[in-house]
Amino acid sequence: PFMIRSDVVNGVMSFAEMDAMMYKIEGEDLYLIGTSEHSMIGKFKGQLIDEKKLPIAMTSYSPCFRKEVGAHGIEERGLYRVHQFEKQEMVVLCKPEDSEEWYNKMLGYTVEFFRSLDIPVRTLECCSGDLADLKVKSCDVEAWSPRQKKYFEVGSCSILGDAQSRRLGIRAKGKEGNYLVTTLNNTVLATPRGMIAVLENNYQADGSVKIPKALQPYMGGKEIISPKKDK
């Protein structure tokens, strides 16, 4: 769903994050999603899941809507930070002891994706003071920007422990009793920032753009996008 109720919003994020990000539908108990993670996690609200069904791994490509309160400066303009965009998101519900394995696996997917496009990337683990609310561990994936001559964030992978499952009442039924599941999320690709990374790292002096080999089959075999010449 592209809209979720307030009980789901309060279960997946803090009030401060909600106030800065979410668009509320006036006169309705509904909010536009800032990420499909919220819809995917919210569908399990109040459920008792058989432990044998864990892990539950999901992915979604959806529109996202964000107010982006507080964003300012030249590097925050244009495609970098917009109010509506599309994003590929991954979510996992698992046993607490399996969270590190899934964290490393999902983080690897994002790094592998960008490197398949010949884009230089690095990972930057967030210190405790930089962690967003509810997160236990988080790592940003950053791509190189030739224009800015620095790396910029293109993805993020996080473990949220039982913060979301406790608020939403998502439990697993195991041999030794019921317990709260651990949730994780991973942004594989937000299309605006992905487009910036592809364009900047493949831009040529004559104004043309090289198409990464991995994308050429989806571009009819085309290798170069050339600028239109003035008539």
Language model features with spans:
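TRNA-recognition modules of translation machinery and tRNA-sensing kinases, especially anticodon-binding
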Residues: 1-231
